[in-house]
Amino acid sequence: MAAVKLEKEVWSSRFAFLMASVGFAVGLGNIWRFPYVAGENGGGAFVVVYLICVLVIGVPVLMAELLIGRRGQSSPPIAVTNIAKENGKSERWKSVGGLGLLAAYTIEIIYSVIVGWVLWYLFKAVTTGFDGVDATIANANFEGMLRDSSIMITATFIGLAITGSVIYAGVQSGIEKAVRFMMPLLFLLLIGLATYNYFTASFYEAMSWLFTPDFSKIDGSTLLAAIGQAFFSIGVAMGGMMAYGAYLPRSVSIGRSAFIIVSADTVVAILAGLVIFPAVFKYGL
């Protein structure tokens, strides 16, 4: 296979690239997994271990993926192939990029369903609201949604259609326009909800559960959990950062960008804990 170079648009600005990259990194690993894993593995002690793993492992891997994408100037498998051929190495290295895409595809199968859940709950919030809904009713409503195949299929299809339309529009007309609106909105929502929780009694209970250090829980399994969380949360090893790197102008610093992406990703994870767990303790979920 001949080396392929993409003739394409690039990110219009460093800010647009950072917003898109943070948007790719932020996901279930931040919103759901990080607060729970931190609380179960020593609270503040786990956070320290996690931050070390992010700086020592996560940032270098992220930099490598962005560099491969920018230098290879193509999709992950072809970008890896281009670089391998430039250095006289086997084209079999393209399997590295292919495995990343396979991982992304597998995760997308899960995410597309969850996006459908979110759209359904957004519809319910606008039409009927959730006044008077306690933990028992909320659980029954959720199980009812899962049993209704028409809701699940329709909501998932709508989510995929929205995502597909954004991607089809391209980098500047699609992804950039979406993230310029959605990412600041995400941060505003998280900050607003965390501020609201600050004035509830359960906020301090959640803070204690999340951040009080318990170094007695730090062992080999905790280290593995921190490394796994770093990879899952930042979004490396899934091909996405390579793909975004392919559209990255050479004037943009990869090292500085990687540090900003990881920092923003970590802030979202911490804010998510301050949003979710005060409600968990308050309502006994």
Which residues are covered by each model-predicted region?
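Membrane-interface "cap" regions at the ends of multi-pass membrane proteins
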Residues: M1-W32, V61-L66, R70-G98, P249-S253
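Inter-helical loop and helix-membrane interface segments of multi-pass membrane transporters/permeases
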Residues: K5-E9, V37-N41, R71-L99, S112-Q172, ...
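Extracellular loop-to-transmembrane helix junctions
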Residues: E9, G39-E65, I151-M152
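Hydrophobic core segments of alpha-helical transmembrane domains in multi-pass membrane transport
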Residues: Y50-P60, L101-V126, A155-A169, P184-N197, ...
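Transmembrane helix-boundary motif of multi-pass solute transporters/channels
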Residues: A16-C53, E205, G240-G245, R256-F259, ...
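Short helix-coil transition sites and intra-membrane helix breaks within transmembrane domains
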Residues: G23-G29, G69-R71, I107-V113, A230-A237
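Hydrophobic alpha-helical transmembrane segments of multi-pass small-molecule transporters/permeases
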Residues: F17-F24, Y50-L55, G97-E108, L160-A161, ...
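Membrane-embedded translocation segments of transport machinery
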Residues: A2-E7, W11, E176, R180-L285
